[in-house]
């Protein structure tokens, strides 16, 4: 297995941002604060299934979507009413996708093969700029402090929609963090549904408890890491902060009894308490996860901030009007046009509200396996079940550990492009500088 001991830049994605302190990871000052659900978790790293998969593009044709098979059951159980795939597609997030602009990777200045590693981050507070609360600033983390990680993988054994690769995702990611970025085993909490200890099961209560542990007592220049592999979905938005009218949710192993966890709650627990200069890196390998932490700044593969773009919905709205006209349904024409105008107005208002209320003085970066409207896929790669997003993330970093955030987004998409339709997303709690 190849190890990369590089001095990582915290700005722009020296992922996960730590200035790796050569030979000695930092001591563990406080452990799991609730107390630890995993006493004695200091065993040797699990087998790294990626050792045989490095450099191999996803070649297997077998995959399972993380969410699509459970869609009807989820909405009946969790929301009280079913919603099928076609209805979900009709309200999909319509931000502009600049990935298909006709530019190849060599024309894209943010392509991981085109430029060197990112510059060091600014050391002083940085102004948010347009759209953020007046006078508000954030601060990048130097990532020289403590490191803590929470990794969750749920295969849903014995349940409808069982997955195969989520636990492997956690094992692979924890090994990668430990061997390449100095995350000590005693500073990681792993919640997977193959463990015997009840406190290590990924139940709703355990997940929420562990989220609180992750951010507890975080100080400037600390580096926190969160990884979720499992089912994701959407539920009607109740607080008006979602452009598409739906909140994103994740499903604990006991979601049928305890319910799901909404993005608003994850933001409240893991983002809102963070101080300036604290880094939180989050990975969501699940369906409909584009804005799973409710971070307000979403970036394209060109490094361009995505403003609300309702062009796709505009096209759908016009098609609806034309279709109604062809049927002679004048009432349908009016209803379709008015409905689109309402969605357009609500989308712009939600985006402005999100930027004003969900910004953070901390340094929060999130990669997700798909857009809010897409499914993520369970794959079979080099004989091992794994999440396509998790596999691509580690593979891209093994090939080039020195990448900016946007470069890494391009690298991940490149790894997935030949076999998978999902498009990983990059979102932040603050605007990215032009570096």
UniProtKB/Swiss-Prot annotation:
Residues 36-46 have a biased composition (Pro residues). One of its GO terms (biological process) is apoptotic process. Residues 1-46, 106-129 are annotated as: Disordered. It comes from the Eukaryota. The keyword Hydrolase applies. Keywords: Apoptosis, Hydrolase, Protease, Thiol protease, Zymogen. InterPro entries: Caspase-like_dom_sf, Metacaspase, Pept_C14_caspase. Its EC number is 3.4.22.-. The keyword Protease applies. It is an enzyme of class 3 (hydrolase). One of its GO terms (molecular function) is cysteine-type endopeptidase activity. The active site is at 231, 287. GO terms for cellular component: cytoplasm. Belongs to the peptidase C14B family. Involved in cell death (apoptosis). This is Metacaspase-1A. It comes from Neosartorya fischeri (strain ATCC 1020 / DSM 3700 / CBS 544.65 / FGSC A1164 / JCM 1740 / NRRL 181 / WB 181) (Aspergillus fischerianus). The lineage of its organism: Eukaryota, Fungi, Dikarya, Ascomycota, Pezizomycotina. The gene is casA.
């Amino acid at each position: 297995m190849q190890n990369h001991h590089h001095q990582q830049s915290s700005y722009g994605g020296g992922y996960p941002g730590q200035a790796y302190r050569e030979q000695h990871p930092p001591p563990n000052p406080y452990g799991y604060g609730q107390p630890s659900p995993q006493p004695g978790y200091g065993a040797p790293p699990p087998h790294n299934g990626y050792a045989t998969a490095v450099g191999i593009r996803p070649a297997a044709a077998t995959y399972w979507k993380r969410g699509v098979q459970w869609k009807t059951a989820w909405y009946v159980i969790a929301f009280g009413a079913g919603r099928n795939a076609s209805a979900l597609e009709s309200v999909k997030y319509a931000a502009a996708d600049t990935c298909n602009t006709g530019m190849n990777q060599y024309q894209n200045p943010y392509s991981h093969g085109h430029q060197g590693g990112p510059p060091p981050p600014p050391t002083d507070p940085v102004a948010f700029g347009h759209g953020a609360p007046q006078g508000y600033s954030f601060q990048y983390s130097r990532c020289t402090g403590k490191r803590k990680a929470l990794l969750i993988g749920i295969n849903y054994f014995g349940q409808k929609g069982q997955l195969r690769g989520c636990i492997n995702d956690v094992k692979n990611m924890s090994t990668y963090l430990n061997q390449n970025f100095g995350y000590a085993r005693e500073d990681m909490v792993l919640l997977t549904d193959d463990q015997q200890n009840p406190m290590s099961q990924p139940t709703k209560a355990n997940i929420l408890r562990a989220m609180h542990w992750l951010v507890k007592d975080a100080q400037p220049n600390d580096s926190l890491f969160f990884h979720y592999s499992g089912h994701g979905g959407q539920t009607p938005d109740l607080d008006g902060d979602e452009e598409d009218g739906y909140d994103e949710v994740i499903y604990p192993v006991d979601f049928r009894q305890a319910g799901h966890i909404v993005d608003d709650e994850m933001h409240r627990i893991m983002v809102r308490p963070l101080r300036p200069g604290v880094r939180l890196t989050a990975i969501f390998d699940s369906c409909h996860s584009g804005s799973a932490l409710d971070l307000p700044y979403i970036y394209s593969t060109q490094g361009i901030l995505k403003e609300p773009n309702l062009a796709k919905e505009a096209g759908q709205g016009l098609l609806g009007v034309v279709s109604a006209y062809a049927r002679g349904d004048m009432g349908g024409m009016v209803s379709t046009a008015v409905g689109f105008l309402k969605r357009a107005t609500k989308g712009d208002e939600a985006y402005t509200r999100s930027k004003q209320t969900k910004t953070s003085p901390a340094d929060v970066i999130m990669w997700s396996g798909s857009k809010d409207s897409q499914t993520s896929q369970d794959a079979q790669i080099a004989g091992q079940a794994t999440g396509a997003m998790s596999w691509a993330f580690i593979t891209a970093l093994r090939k080039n550990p020195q990448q900016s955030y946007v470069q890494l987004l391009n690298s991940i998409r490149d790894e997935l492009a030949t076999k998978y339709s999902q498009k990983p997303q990059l979102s932040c709690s603050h605007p990215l500088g032009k570096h």
